[in-house]
UniProtKB/Swiss-Prot annotation:
Gene name as annotated: GKN3P
Primary role: May inhibit gastric epithelial cell proliferation.
Alphabetical GO biological process terms: regulation of cell population proliferation
Name listed for the protein in its UniProt record: Gastrokine-3
Cysteines joined through disulfide linkages: C80-C137
Keywords: Disulfide bond, Secreted, Signal
Annotated GO CC locations: extracellular space
Lineage start: Eukaryota, Metazoa, Chordata, Craniata, Vertebrata
Domain BRICHOS: 53-145
Organism superkingdom: Eukaryota
Transmembrane segment boundaries: none
Amino acid sequence: MKHLVASSILGVFVLTPSLAMMNIRFNHPLYGSFGTQIIHIGAFQGMVSIRDNNIFSEWDGILDYKNALLVAKVFNKMACVLARMDKAVFPSLDDISKALDKQAFKYYPSTRGLTYTVLPSWVKNLAQYGKPIKNMCRDDPTYFAQQQKEGTALAIDSNSCFEIQLLSFMGLFICGETPGL
């Protein structure tokens, strides 16, 4: 019994610092380097969370790499948009992490011009997309969006589009004629 207690206490003292170092290694906050964005990478969870406090385009977002989902909460529209993330087009979680570590954004291909069209259907059960997405969007209507194929002409008023900029290499447009957007 004494050995069990001693090994448990030793395990706590040995494991706790190593787990703390792992947490620091996998979570890279970026404060103010790109205007008002704060970026948090949780590599273990496979998620990137973004907060942009720009008064002209305030939004929060989650890139869920494990489930290939992206969600954006657009504050001035009081709505959330949920879409499938095309992993072939988006920088990998590792690329974003390396870019934050090295501030080497110029080496990553631009995704400017990706356009998502908001569909009129609401997301009825946010819980199925995970707790972070549910918590972000629980107080606002959440709509599905679909990525437009490159070169496809939009039959949407360009004034209905909202631009989301992540770092310097990812620009997205969310367009739609849905209430709130």
